Design a protein with these regions (language model features):
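Condensing-enzyme catalytic core mediating Claisen C-C bond formation in acyl metabolism
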Residues: 8-63, 161-226, 231-234, 265-284, ...
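Short, well-ordered amphipathic alpha-helical segments that serve as non-catalytic structural scaffolds
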Residues: 66-82, 130, 216-231, 298-303
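Acidic, glycine-rich active-site loops and adjacent beta-strand->loop/helix elements
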Residues: 94-99, 121-122, 147-153, 200-201, ...
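A generic, well-ordered mixed alpha/beta core segment in the N-terminal half of proteins
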Residues: 104-156, 160-172
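Active-site-proximal alpha-helical scaffold in enzymes
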Residues: 118-145, 182-184, 290-311
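Conserved beta-ketoacyl condensing-enzyme motif
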Residues: 28, 62-121, 238-253
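Short glycine/threonine-rich loop-to-helix capping motif typified by GTGT followed
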Residues: 104-107, 247-262, 327-335
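Cysteine-centered motifs
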Residues: 3-4
């Protein structure tokens, strides 16, 4: 199916059942990453724009600290893009807390029209998808996308108070303290191009273990990857990397096995942001990192530079989310997953 507008206007193209190919790529003009001390001590520590000395970031509460992460990340990415707040048409932002309070308190001072989005740890992919479509459609000149998470605020929201000192199983992940922000627009200097996307569907295999979110999210990632390859008529080898957000070591194994059952082999090209951001053994993070800050800061600090330099030509970036809450968990509900895929390509032509 092809959707056209009048001559002279931008044409976008829908491909397959549920994917979009942008007729005019959207530029990722800049990315910014701010993380906590633990993330700064990990393998990617030297790549982040800013590393906090402690996880309160000079604030009185964990939630206020996360709000400051978003505020500072948005300021930093606008500064990199050469924009002021009044130059930004729309802001797409989200976090893990109830009613997205980290977002609403964090970016309120900018006075930018806000689309608050929530897809759990897939929120970065959702924000980039919606922001890119808005820019590609000619509805916005400048767009900022930002997501955040915080280990302590997430533990308080979804699990146990830190003072409780509960033991975590090896399948558990460690919520990343960090915020990643991105400036999007058309016909501008690019660090990478957004050329297409495959929005995720809710996939529920009936798993109820909130301490094994990688396994809960892996079926959704497999579903999105399979649909993406079918819609775009491409093979995994056409991507330098297929990058999930925070499946961790357990979820990675499940994802690879699920796709192999469908005749799709991504083992040699799969990368997971949650595995990359921590040294699981040295930092005792078990299955790896998680949170909607995990994929965002890894994209800004690690993935974009590889695309900008031309070392990677094309990647499929799909943050993964576990759609649970305290209420759903306590009522015995399962943990559905979702994964939004975004195609990122290098601006370097060789």
């Amino acid at each position: 199916m092809q959707c056209c507008r009048m001559e002279g206007e931008i044409m976008n193209q829908r491909v397959g059942r549920s994917s979009i190919r942008l007729a005019q790529p959207v530029c990722v003009i800049a990315g910014a990453s701010i993380v906590g001390k633990k993330e700064g001590e990990g393998p990617l520590g030297a790549l982040f724009d800013m590393v906090g000395e402690d996880d309160l970031f000079g604030c009185k509460t964990w939630e206020e600290a996360e709000s400051n992460l978003q505020k500072d990340a948005v300021y930093m990415v606008m500064e990199k893009a050469g924009w002021k707040a009044e130059d930004v048409s729309y802001l797409f932002a989200g976090d893990l807390l109830g009613q997205c309070i980290a977002t609403s308190f964090g970016i309120s001072a900018y006075n930018i029209p806000l689309f608050g989005v929530y897809g759990a740890c897939s929120t970065c992919g959702e924000a980039l998808t919606l922001g890119a479509v808005m820019a590609a459609g000619g509805y916005a000149e400048h767009v900022v996308c930002v997501t955040s998470s915080h280990f302590a605020s997430a533990e308080k929201e979804f699990r146990f108070p830190l003072d409780y000192g509960n033991q975590r199983p090896l399948s558990a992940s460690w919520t990343v303290t960090g915020s990643g922000a991105f400036a999007l627009g058309l016909n501008q200097k690019c660090r990478a191009h957004i050329t297409g996307m495959t929005p995720g569907r809710i996939v529920d295999y009936g798993l109820k273990d909130s301490m094994n979110m990688g396994a809960c999210m892996a079926p959704a990632a497999a579903d999105t990857i399979e649909r993406h390859l079918e819609d775009f008529h491409v093979q995994p080898q056409e991507y330098d990397r297929i990058i999930t957000g925070d499946l961790g070591s357990v979820g990675q194994t499940v994802l690879i096995d699920l796709l192999r059952e469908k005749g799709i082999d991504i083992a040699g090209r799969h990368m997971d942001c949650g595995i990359e951001i921590f040294d699981a053994d040295a930092q005792d993070t078990h299955a790896g990192g998680s949170g909607c800050g995990c994929s965002a800061v890894t994209l800004a600090a690690y993935i974009l530079p590889k695309l900008e330099s031309g070392k990677w030509k094309k990647v499929l970036f799909l943050p993964t989310g576990a759609l649970l809450s305290k209420t759903s968990f306590n009522e015995g509900k399962s943990v559905p997953g979702i994964a939004h895929a975004v195609v990122l390509e290098s601006p370097v032509v060789k």
